[in-house]
Amino acid sequence: MRVMIVDDSAVVRGMVTRWLEEAGFIIAAIAVDGGQALRKLADTSVDVCLLDIEMPVMSGLEALPKLLAAKPDLRVIMASTLTERGAEVTLRALDLGAADYIAKPSANKLGGADLYRKDLIEKVRHLGARAARPAPPQAAPRPTLAPPSSDPAGPIEAVVVASSTGGPPALRRFIAGLGADWTSPILIAQHMPPGFTRTLAQMLDPISHLTAREAQNGEPIVPGVIYVAPGDYHMTVRAAGGGGPSIHLDQGPEVNYCRPSADPLFESAARFWKGRVLGVVLTGMGRDGRDGAAVLAKVGGTIIAQDEATSVVWGMPGAVANAGLAEAVLPLDQIGPYIASRARSVA
């Protein structure tokens, strides 16, 4: 697997080169800015590019669309800072076609560099493996449908969503596909650090008539709202004093190496709404959401998984599909309309 490193810091270039070479990757090219990266890409075979956002001459955000125009199948990982501006620029980059991002460790965070190294190696390995596969056929993939595990338990009172790598752009398209009549609350566990999730909610807010916001502990869950789990917090559903659903946030142990994790969200939603909740598992690495989907399916809830062809990484949805938990395995743009149609049929 061939990697290009683009960063204006000699220290970062040297450190990342050493890490990736020790992990068995080939460093095909190294560049100090976006312009140099474009010139090197013209005569170098590259599978994955680690692209810094803030650089002189040509920034990562400026270079990204040019790199993808030159090599459409290039998998780009944006290297971002854990700041509000870093979050905004990163989400813009994901919309422009970046496959993923990695948050640079803060200097005062104990063990930050080691976690960064492990995260980087995992992302490069998964994205590089995807880039090495043959391109999917141009024809639209056919959806895989399975019979429902049980009869619909009544109207869909809520939707819970799991997403990770490639999730922000996928969430935009999924929400847009629900249509103007959708009112049931949507609860999202997207793997992102603190600060990024607030920016994600702001990005999702204008997509539809629904109000999107970062969830707050104890607030009631009401129709017409999209709740995004804050970074570094698990989000679950609990009964409020009057018996209605409310948001509970906690910093319990990571689940599937994640916080927020989809499994606690799905499991708590299954306990509260039983079969009247629908789970959606979108693109992402790992298997987060699989165990929660199993709990949800056991009480009669419905699970929809994104298909492999439209996923950046078919880890999470693949785990659900391969476990036989999904009623439907669909291309991304079919998920929203499918759910909206299903909701109308049981209303």
From Swiss-Prot:
The modification 4-aspartylphosphate is found at D52. InterPro entries: CheB-like (IPR008248), CheB_C (IPR035909), CheY-like_superfamily (IPR011006), Sig_transdc_resp-reg_Me-estase (IPR000673), Sig_transdc_resp-reg_receiver (IPR001789). Transmembrane segments: none annotated. Keywords: Chemotaxis, Cytoplasm, Hydrolase, Phosphoprotein. Its main location: cytoplasm. GO terms for molecular function: phosphorelay response regulator activity; protein-glutamate methylesterase activity; protein-glutamine glutaminase activity. It comes from the Bacteria. It is found in: Cytoplasm. GO terms for cellular component: cytoplasm. GO terms for biological process: chemotaxis. The keyword Amino-acid biosynthesis does not apply. Phosphorylated by CheA. Phosphorylation of the N-terminal regulatory domain activates the methylesterase activity. Residues 131-153 are annotated as: Disordered. It catalyses: [protein]-L-glutamate 5-O-methyl ester + H2O = L-glutamyl-[protein] + methanol + H(+); L-glutaminyl-[protein] + H2O = L-glutamyl-[protein] + NH4(+). The active site is at S164, H191, D288. Its EC number is 3.1.1.61, 3.5.1.44. Residues 152-346 form the CheB-type methylesterase domain. Residues 134-150 have a biased composition (Pro residues). PANTHER family: PROTEIN-GLUTAMATE METHYLESTERASE/PROTEIN-GLUTAMINE GLUTAMINASE, PROTEIN-GLUTAMATE METHYLESTERASE_PROTEIN-GLUTAMINE GLUTAMINASE 1. Involved in chemotaxis. Part of a chemotaxis signal transduction system that modulates chemotaxis in response to various stimuli. Catalyzes the demethylation of specific methylglutamate residues introduced into the chemoreceptors (methyl-accepting chemotaxis proteins or MCP) by CheR. Also mediates the irreversible deamidation of specific glutamine residues to glutamic acid. Belongs to the CheB family. Contains a C-terminal catalytic domain, and an N-terminal region which modulates catalytic activity. This is Protein-glutamate methylesterase/protein-glutamine glutaminase 2. The gene is cheB2.
